Amino acid sequence: CKGIDKIISKDPSGDLTEQFDVHIPLLSIPGIFNTEVDTIPSNGPYIVPDSTRVAEWKDRLEVHDKSYKIGLVWASSPDNRELYHKKSCKLNHFEPALNIHGLSFYSLQKGPASAEIDNLNNGTKIINLDSELKDFSDTAAAISNLDLVISVDTSVAHLAGALGKPVWLLLSFVPDWRWLIERDDSPWYPN
């Protein structure tokens, strides 16, 4: 990446593997660059998933039918309990929509919240991909085969935006600053 000589990571214990000159939290970068709404670089899509994985996921998702395919994420990571309750909702709130003819829902939900699928009424249709999404490249390949992603404010929403997929983002009443509450779109992603 232009301007970045090297990315230094932490080892499994959380210690840095090397010394470095500068550290900046990711969400501080727009402030450092004096970013304004009209200077946000949103030329997307800027992430392209592995074509072999995309083809594998196409076969996996085409098995079910030719309907409009929607990925769904209803909960953020439970690791941050305060944000979890502000950003997450329960899957059963979506239950009326899950059986609409012509729509196929695929759960992109990871972690404990994916178990909520087991609590839905019999006959409610949502395909749980939790065990098949081994890493973020699987998630990217699966999203590439969907028509829409509906998500709470999580990394999956950002990934879908970076892939150029349409995203319906479910925000809390007082959302994070980057979503600009006076708008109904996002300048961060052109889709």
Where are these regions (language model features)?
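Catalytic machinery of carbohydrate-active enzymes
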Residues: 1-191
